[in-house]
């Protein structure tokens, strides 16, 4: 969990038995302290490894099978991925939730050999977010503007996806 903030995602993953261990990192010490308090509150502190890290720089490859990067801009997510060679191992899965610059991130991913396997939208309160599930295939490709702006969202049939597409069309 890159950019863990208060550690809620890490705790949720453990509580819901999605995984039995989580490495959560943040670039600042204060969010890591908050994440430790959250882990202690929910009794999972023995299964969370917290690391002070700029992106994935302090995360050993052995601790990063699935990589989750949420709540950052698309350019920062691309930078984090570009600085970490092991994200290009085909066994790794990426879950990315960009807050801004989504077309930039899609272009980066596709042009550097990542495949966007699926996209979905989710609504939290009044905000609609897009989530990308990606993996490295080594197949680099250029994408057109339509795909850069909409990705695989038009294929999704959920109400959240329709809401996301409407929101994006109004923004353009």
Q: Whereabouts are the PLM-identified features?
A:
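Conserved SAM-binding loop of SAM-dependent methyltransferases across substrates and taxa
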Residues: 6-19
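Short helix-capping segments at alpha-helix termini
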Residues: 17-18, 40-46, 86-89
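Conserved SAM-binding motif I beta-strand of class I
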Residues: 21-26
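Class I S-adenosyl-L-methionine
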Residues: 57, 63, 75-171
């Amino acid at each position: 969990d890159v950019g863990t903030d208060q550690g809620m995602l890490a705790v949720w993953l453990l509580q819901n038995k999605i995984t039995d261990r989580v490495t959560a990192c943040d670039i600042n010490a204060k969010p890591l302290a908050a994440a430790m308090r959250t882990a202690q509150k929910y009794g999972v502190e023995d299964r969370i490894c917290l690391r002070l890290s700029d992106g994935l720089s302090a995360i050993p490859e052995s601790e990063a099978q699935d990589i989750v990067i949420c709540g950052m801009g698309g350019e920062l997510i691309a930078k984090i991925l570009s600085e970490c060679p092991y994200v290009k191992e085909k066994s790794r899965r990426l879950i990315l939730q960009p807050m801004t610059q989504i077309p930039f991130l899609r272009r980066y991913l596709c042009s550097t050999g990542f495949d966007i396997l699926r996209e979905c939208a989710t609504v939290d309160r009044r905000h609609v977010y897009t989530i990308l599930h990606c993996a490295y295939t080594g197949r680099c490709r250029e994408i057109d503007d339509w795909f850069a702006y909409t990705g695989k969202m038009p294929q999704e049939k959920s109400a959240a996806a329709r809401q996301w597409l409407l929101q994006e069309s109004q923004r353009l």
